[in-house]
Amino acid sequence: MSIDTQKVIEDNKRSSADTGSPEVQVALLTARIELLTGHFKTHKKDHHSRRGLLQMVNRRRSLLDYLKKKDVERYKALIEKLGLRR
């Protein structure tokens, strides 16, 4: 179980050389969060990894807040594309 980083970047980049835009960062974090969520279904007591998951969720929240402040249309498009509720 791993994420295909290149595919996630390809699906969410804004230009040909884009790897660091908020959209790409949020998409990568979302993929990692979904992967870890599945991990916790079988490993309920893995508290060390759960801490990392919470850090990723908080980082994603910060990036989404930044994007919402900078460009609401890009924010709405990203939320809809990734299926995040807010």
Curated annotation (Swiss-Prot):
InterPro entries registered for this protein in UniProt: Ribosomal_uS15, Ribosomal_uS15_bac-type, uS15_NS1_RNA-bd_sf
BP-aspect Gene Ontology terms: translation
Cellular component GO terms, alphabetical: cytosolic small ribosomal subunit
TM region positions: none
GO molecular function, one term: structural constituent of ribosome
Claim: Membrane is one of the keywords in the record: no
Pfam hit, one: Ribosomal_S15
PROSITE patterns recorded: RIBOSOMAL_S15 (PS00362)
CDD domains reported for this sequence: Ribosomal_S15p_S13e
Keywords associated with the record: Ribonucleoprotein, Ribosomal protein, RNA-binding, rRNA-binding
Source domain of life: Bacteria
Disordered: region residues: 1-22
Stretches with biased composition (Basic and acidic residues): 7-16
Family that this chain belongs to: Belongs to the universal ribosomal protein uS15 family.
Description of how the protein assembles with itself and partners: Part of the 30S ribosomal subunit. Forms a bridge to the 50S subunit in the 70S ribosome, contacting the 23S rRNA.
Function: One of the primary rRNA binding proteins, it binds directly to 16S rRNA where it helps nucleate assembly of the platform of the 30S subunit by binding and bridging several RNA helices of the 16S rRNA. Forms an intersubunit bridge (bridge B4) with the 23S rRNA of the 50S subunit in the ribosome.
NCBIfam families reported for this sequence: S15_bact
Protein name in the entry: Small ribosomal subunit protein uS15
